[in-house]
């Protein structure tokens, strides 16, 4: 079956040190790049794209992926930003991709496969994997019980589903629950977090990841490449607690 076009949505606020990670995530996707669109909603004081020259350079780096960049002078909640990006999206399939998560190359394809297998209109994982660069790159994991606890950064859904549910809640934590609550049957399906992403613990996390550092230790089960490790070190080099 032919793969559909997908709009990838990234909300950001003063996360420019994560630009190399964002570009790496896009580049590694095992998906036809000409079928992808990247939408950025930025309300930071340090703009992601500061000039027409910057815009031209980013477009060149991610080509043939198309880029839509929007900057707003007033800081808004993550839920508001996610809703705005969906409305700006060209395509009928939406994938969330947050700034500070390391995505697996399989994220888009495996999510789409699950959507088709289950006849779902939204898929995502209620599991989470965390990596702690400040603690010798320890990796831990948790598994939540409910579909409403699907991690927003792992969501792939249709615009039709978004419109039917009224979008994300207008807050910055747990905003994705409104995309699941009240949706019965198999319209919402669960993906494996190992096919999606790893959350990176750092000082600027929206939700403090330190609370999960003593959960299940899966360090030996996750094979991070030296390139991935060096990328994280470079991104967090200004954080005092990282062991470089």
Where do the language-model regions lie?
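Short beta-strand/loop segment that forms part of the nucleotide-sugar
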Residues: 34-47, 68-72
């Amino acid at each position: 079956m032919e793969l559909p076009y997908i709009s990838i949505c990234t909300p950001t606020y003063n996360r420019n040190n994560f630009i190399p990670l964002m570009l790496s995530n896009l580049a590694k996707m095992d998906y036809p790049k000409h079928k992808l669109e990247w939408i950025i909603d930025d309300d930071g004081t340090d703009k992601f794209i500061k000039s027409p020259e910057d815009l031209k350079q980013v477009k060149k780096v991610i080509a043939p992926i198309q880029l839509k960049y929007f900057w707003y002078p007033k800081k808004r909640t993550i839920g508001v930003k996610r809703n705005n990006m969906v409305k700006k999206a060209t395509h009928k399939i939406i994938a969330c991709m947050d700034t500070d998560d390391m995505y697996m190359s399989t994220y888009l394809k495996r999510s789409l496969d699950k959507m088709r297998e289950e006849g779902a209109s939204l898929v995502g994982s209620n599991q989470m994997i965390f990596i702690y660069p400040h603690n010798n790159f320890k990796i831990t994991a948790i598994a939540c019980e409910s579909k409403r606890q699907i991690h927003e950064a792992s969501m792939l859904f249709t615009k039709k589903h978004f419109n039917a549910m009224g979008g994300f809640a207008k807050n910055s934590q747990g905003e994705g629950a409104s995309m699941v609550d009240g949706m019965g049957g198999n319209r919402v399906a669960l993906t494996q977090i190992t096919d999606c992403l790893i959350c990176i613990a750092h000082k600027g996390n929206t939700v403090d990841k330190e609370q999960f550092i003593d959960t299940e230790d899966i360090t030996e089960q996750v094979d991070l490449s030296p390139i991935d490790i060096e990328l994280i070190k470079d991104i967090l080099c200004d954080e005092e607690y990282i062991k470089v």
